[in-house]
């Protein structure tokens, strides 16, 4: 599997959309502008070109690509990025913490769209938000797709 970070910032405390960055020096100066917080489809395209030119990476990517990061679903471009990486592999996954306020959030809509495009959503479960936010959405994710990887965190 090839794991690709598509999100520079993550703030799981502002659950549905990123509002500020908590990444610290030495990365902070390049993240002052929000345009650098998220990978773009153009950057994803450049990465795909590079991956295709490095045989071991290309072989790994063909098996599986995992889109991850601080919180990949906060990237407003994630559906388009997913489509770009699908040109490299039929097996593209997205990892999320599923710490989302509701089914009406943009993050949830992005996850649903990726499952419609035959992507798989994998999640990390946290006891601190399990009952309030993750449990209701986990059942919905399971209905949208066949199989998933679940990481459990004990806090």
Locate each region found by the language model.
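N-terminal [4Fe-4S]-dependent radical SAM core
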Residues: 1-7, 14-17, 53-61
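Core AdoMet radical
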Residues: 2-3, 23-42, 58-75, 88-104, ...
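Hydrophobic adenine-recognition pocket in adenosine-nucleotide-binding enzymes
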Residues: 9-10, 72
